[in-house]
Amino acid sequence: MIKVYVSRFNSETDSEPHLECYEIEKTPQMKVLDALQAINEKYDADISFRSSCRAGQCGSCGILFKGNGALACQKEIMDGAIIEPLNFPVIKDLIVDKSSIEAKVKDLELSLQCDHKCSELNTSITKEDTQDTKKVRSCIECYSCLSTCPVVNIATEEFGGPYLMRYIDKFETDPRENFDRLKEALDEGLYKCTSCGKCLAVCPKNINTFGDAIEKMRAIAVANGSGPLPEHVAFKENILKNGRSVTTDKTPFIEQIENYKGSKIAFFTGCMVDYKFPEIGQMLVDVLKENGIDIDVPEGQVCCGSPLLRTGQTDIVQDLVDKNKEVFKDYDTIITICSGCGATLKNNHPEFGSKLHVMDISEFLVDKLDTEKLKDIDMTVTYHDPCHLGRGQGIKDAPRKIIEMIPGITFNEMKYPCQCCGAGGGIKSGKPEIAMDLAKSKAEMVKETDADAVITICPFCELNIRDGLDAIGCENIKVMHLLELLTKSYE
């Protein structure tokens, strides 16, 4: 027997929704849709929900499963599951009113508008011509992405969300389209996406809305002078001056460190560690030394290009990739301690002709850590999954395993550890009010765990979560890089 919690609400009789618990027998590979039907049959519960094809093709059975968008016919039920309606006005139980998004689509005239342009096409359209638009055309309108997007949930009127961005891009990249779709994208908040990747994670058709739609439209905006945001221009200017997307009044970490010539393991510092947080770079060197590992920190390395790729300023990215490829070509393994850098090196650099063996510090250390040297730390901690580590690199277990190896630590998981903190996608610099709202939401989750510190593996996340905790009056809760926690245990 398993327990399943279902949100119940009738707009005609109830003032607010509530969860009801049901116990049912779980059959092998039982889906949420099967569970809802079993509950209705056993309890005569009359739970209202939509369904049709049962094959993941119609999108009608979209729901929230443990807080994330999903198809009821595809998601396997589990003990303790919470089933809620999508984030739209609720009509009854799991049935929602989608008229607002349907009206938006109608207002934007989101259908092919080719006018006279079609008649002027003198050549046939090839597969290559439609390659970009095909990547985003398989949407089944389940609205899982809209209900899961962190920005939509806190700024509904400001950001059209991944569903509309994908829809607009479908026509922006269609060679027959004659409307100015880019203006629509800008009006709907093209630069208000954090690049968290949650929409891809919940999409039953694996549509990469940020990578294949938003990021590309941002590049088009830059090319025609409509972008980037003024606050993003400095990224490129700084890189052209010193190879880093940020400035510093400190001595860069690379200039401070003694290199271990001959080591086949290298450290890709990233801009933030080299210029803003050199102490974290030193912690990496010290922790590895405790484990008998020498690491080289080669000179000549430059920004990974992530700030440029995320904001559409792509024209000098190839040069950055080539420089880093040359610097790191003779190393067997490249270590990163910034999730954004790691994701960019792994996922974007191969598109520019560079494929290095890159590992996040947690995946590198998890099976090498000398636990006998670790000393007790009397501390309660929680962990924040950086978007570009958890979803961008698929690394979730390794950091937690390392934390739990440290004696004396009490680990409390927060409600939604993988919810975006608001630091990415150029949001913290370009739309700081959105970044702050998301940071405060994350900070509240941290507060609920009664943790002394929140651990993460991203300098950008560290900064934004710190701002969020300060904003809600939790200055006493520390924000620590995983390496800082390990350093404390090795002292």
Model-based region annotation:
Residues 7, 24-25, 64-68:
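Short strand-turn-strand beta-turns centered on an Asx-Gly dipeptide
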Residues 133, 141, 168-302, 306-353:
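Iron-sulfur-cluster electron-transfer modules
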Residues 37-70, 126-139, 180-197, 290-300, ...:
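Immediate flanking context of iron-sulfur cluster ligation sites
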Residues 30-42, 84-242, 319, 365, ...:
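Ferredoxin-type iron-sulfur electron-transfer modules in oxidoreductases and energy-metabolism complexes
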Residues 73, 272-357, 388-491:
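Cofactor-cradling patches in redox/metallo enzymes
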